Amino acid sequence: MYRTADKLLEQLKKLIRREFNRLGIIGFDELNAFRVTKETTDLFIRLMAENMKRYLLAAKNANANAKALAIAAGFVDREIPVPDEAWVRAFLASYNFVSGYLYEQEAERKRLRLAEQIMTAKEYQSRTQYNDSLRRAANLWWSQTLHYMLDTVDSATLEAYELMGVKKVEWHTHMDGKECKVCRERHLKVYPIGDVPPKPHRNCRCRLMPVPIKK
């Protein structure tokens, strides 16, 4: 279910590292409030654009996979809308109940924090502090990128199921001993398609499978 998403995430992980490393080579003598604002703004515009491209690919793949699973479960094959860029934008603009924030607003908060940390590092002429700030910012952006990638897949999957006529889904937890208590308790529970509980934590990889018509 997340195989394509994981491949796209590997691309994004390398891109994030490259983008923040590029910012790290700027010398202290080149930094001022205007330059820092421009550099960090341009950085996050690029990062969000790259995420958008890959979220769209992941959503389309999830749509196709969900349709195939629904057909395998006995639902009639039919044409259903495929996610487009507008779909991804609308999804990212919605409130996320797991993260507790809005995607773009959180990206701007991360940018502002990074800009402030860079200016503080310059004030103290601390290259170590500068590099640490970039590393923390990269890790935080990676965390947000990962979380929203998995949520994109989940949202596109559920929507495709519903469009295919699926009425109920079954929660499947990967029972490897590392699962959380909530996910363990939800394993194999059946939920109406419109009443599936939010994932209990970030980066949850529990799957939702269509309940066959005969059930």
Per-region residue spans from a language model:
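N-terminal leader/targeting and assembly helices and adjacent pre-domain segments
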Residues: 1-156, 164-165, 212-215
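Acidic, glycine-rich two-metal-ion catalytic cores of nucleic acid-processing enzymes
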Residues: 132-215
